[in-house]
Curated annotation (Swiss-Prot):
It comes from Nitratidesulfovibrio vulgaris (strain ATCC 29579 / DSM 644 / CCUG 34227 / NCIMB 8303 / VKM B-1760 / Hildenborough). The gene is plsX. GO terms for molecular function: phosphate:acyl-[acyl carrier protein] acyltransferase activity. Gene3D superfamilies: Isopropylmalate Dehydrogenase. PANTHER family: FATTY ACID/PHOSPHOLIPID SYNTHESIS PROTEIN PLSX (PTHR30100), PHOSPHATE ACYLTRANSFERASE (PTHR30100:SF1). This is Phosphate acyltransferase. Keywords: Cytoplasm, Lipid biosynthesis, Lipid metabolism, Phospholipid biosynthesis, Phospholipid metabolism, Transferase.
Amino acid sequence: MNSTIIAVDAMGGDFGPSVVVPGAVDAARERGLKVLLVGDRQKVEEELARIPLDGVEVEVVHASEVAGMDEKPSDILRRKKDASIQVVCRLVRDGHAHGIVSAGHSGASVACGMFIMGRVPGVERPALASVMPTEKQPIVLLDVGANVDCKPHHLFQFGLMANAFARDLLGYETPRIGLLSIGEEEGKGNTLVKEAYELFKLAQNINFVGNVEGRDLFTGEVDVVVCDGFVGNVALKLSEGLSSSMSRVLKRELLSGFLPKLGTLLARSAFKRFARVVDYAEYGGAPLLGLQSIAIVCHGKSNAKAIKSAVNMAATFVEKKTNERVVQAICANEELTRYGKAVRQ
C-alpha cells in the first residue's frame, strides 16, 4: 500500500450511508487518500451516484450484515461474521487498509478492534480517547468507556498512549498529564487513583502534573486527563448534556425580545466562532488507542462533517506513525508497568 487507505463502516451511525459516504468521500478528495466504503453495496453505490467522484479514490466492499445497536458485542463478534464492522477490521488485519472509522455500535467497534485487529504488544487494555474543547486548547480525556473496571497500571498505560496521541495529533510538544480525582493533593482519591498516581510519579519520560478535579476539565491547564472508563464516560456524557442544555437556554434567551435579538445579530461572528469550538464534529470521533492499527469510534449522531474529521484523524495517525510512539512508550515503561501489577497482587 502506497497511499493511506482508511476502511469506513458505511452502515454505521443513525443515518448510515447518507452521511457516512459523503463525509468519507470529502476526506478522500481533500486529503488525497483512498477510502474503502464497507456495507450494503447497493445502498452505498446509490449514495455515491449523488456525489462527483472525479479524482477520488473510492472502493466499495460489500458486507451483507449490520451490527444492531440492541445486540451484545460478543454476539456480533461470534455470529455476524459479515457485519460491516467486522469486515473493516479484517481489511486492516489482512493488510488492505491502514485504519478504520465507524459510527456504529461502539461496543462492537471496541470488541472487533481488539479481537480482529489485535492489541499493541504490552498493552493490556486499549482505551477510548475523546478530544474535548476547553477555554484554551483541546484536551484528551481517556478512558471514556472501553474499560469500566481498571487497575492502576491500566491508567498508567492510558496516560502513556495519550501522551503520544496528544503530541502527534494535537501538536503538544510536552503534554501535561493529569489524573482525575476528587482533590488536587497527592493522596486524594480512591485506591485506584492513589496507586496509579505513584506509577505516574515514578515515570521519567512524561510530564505528569498530578491530580486534577472535574472543574479543571475545561480550563485547559492540562493536555491529557486520565481516568477509568466508568468515570470518563460519565464525565463525557455530562459535558455533552450540559453543553446541549446551555445552548438551548442561550438560544431561548437571545430570541426573547428585540434587544436580545439585536445583540445576537451584532455578535453573530463571535457566536459562530464559539459554535465551531464546541462542535463535536470538528474532532470527528474517539480513537481507540492501543490497537495494532488505528480505529476511530464516532458518535452515533455523527453528520458528514464528523465522519470527514474522523477519517482525517485516522489518516494523520497513520501518516505520523503514532503507533510507533505508543509502542516505544509502552516498551520504555515495561518495568514500571510490571511493578504496578506486582503491587496489586
